[in-house]
Amino acid sequence: MIGKLSGKIDSQGDDYIIIDVNGVGYLVYASGKTLGKLAEGEFYKLFIETHVREEHIHLYGFLTLEEKNFFNLLQSVNGIGTRMALSILSSLTPSDIQIAINNEDKNIFKAISGVGAKLAERIVLELKGKVAKISSGSVIIKDSLNIKNITPVASNEVIKALVNLGFSRFEAQNAVQGIIIQNPEISIDELIKTALKNRNAGL
């Protein structure tokens, strides 16, 4: 599974870029907001979400872990797939989404092409309580994602442990939330080991 790509932007389409990594061009789909920040010929590091299906392998790229995590979170809503998740992230930042959900503002989602009244309502209802704003101003996924083994207190202890191991607090928070989303049943020991392994692998 590809978790990160670093290379130069070779070309760009309406909803994708070709990123050249050591002479190999990877087609990576991205939101409009991400595409707007990329320039051909420039070097970037992209966080990658890999979707493997029988008929294809698709890569989705993000400049921040925050956007990647919201890409996955949006797909937890019934009726939202990868294309719709990217469409929403093309119109709204993760912070915009968090504010709209907490304010139960369905209209902001209805304004997005392809999002009707029923889907907008599901987004608010199904995601309310799953996002929380932390003091630093970034957005994290709350522990309501069926996390069985990691309590909020334990999560904070893991973050502290990672900071002591050389992570910045922001890196530790993003690492913990990303791993927990992918594996809600992970133990604390495995969570720390996975965070260290991912960092050493450049993920």
UniProtKB/Swiss-Prot annotation:
Q: Where is this region: Domain II?
A: 64-142
User: Cellular component terms, GO, for this chain's entry?
Assistant: cytoplasm; Holliday junction helicase complex; Holliday junction resolvase complex
Its subcellular locations are: Cytoplasm
Record the organism: Rickettsia felis (strain ATCC VR-1525 / URRWXCal2) (Rickettsia azadi)
Q: Where is this region: Domain III?
A: 150-203
Residues in coiled coil: none
Stored Pfam families: HHH_5, RuvA_C, RuvA_N
Tell me the segments the record calls region Flexible linker: 143-149
| Key words of the record | Cytoplasm, DNA damage, DNA recombination, DNA repair, DNA-binding
What highest taxon heads this organism's lineage? Answer: Bacteria
Q: What this chain does, per the record?
A: The RuvA-RuvB-RuvC complex processes Holliday junction (HJ) DNA during genetic recombination and DNA repair, while the RuvA-RuvB complex plays an important role in the rescue of blocked DNA replication forks via replication fork reversal (RFR). RuvA specifically binds to HJ cruciform DNA, conferring on it an open structure. The RuvB hexamer acts as an ATP-dependent pump, pulling dsDNA into and through the RuvAB complex. HJ branch migration allows RuvC to scan DNA until it finds its consensus sequence, where it cleaves and resolves the cruciform DNA.
Principal location: cytoplasm
The processes (GO biological process) annotated in the record are: DNA recombination; DNA repair
Query: Is Transferase set as a keyword in this record?
Result: no
User: Aminoacyl-tRNA synthetase as a keyword?
Assistant: no
Record remark on domains: Has three domains with a flexible linker between the domains II and III and assumes an 'L' shape. Domain III is highly mobile and contacts RuvB.
Could you tell me which residues belong to the region Domain I?
Answer: 1-63
Q: Spell out the protein name for this chain.
A: Holliday junction branch migration complex subunit RuvA
Q: Which family does it belong to?
A: Belongs to the RuvA family.
Q: Name one GO molecular function term.
A: four-way junction DNA binding
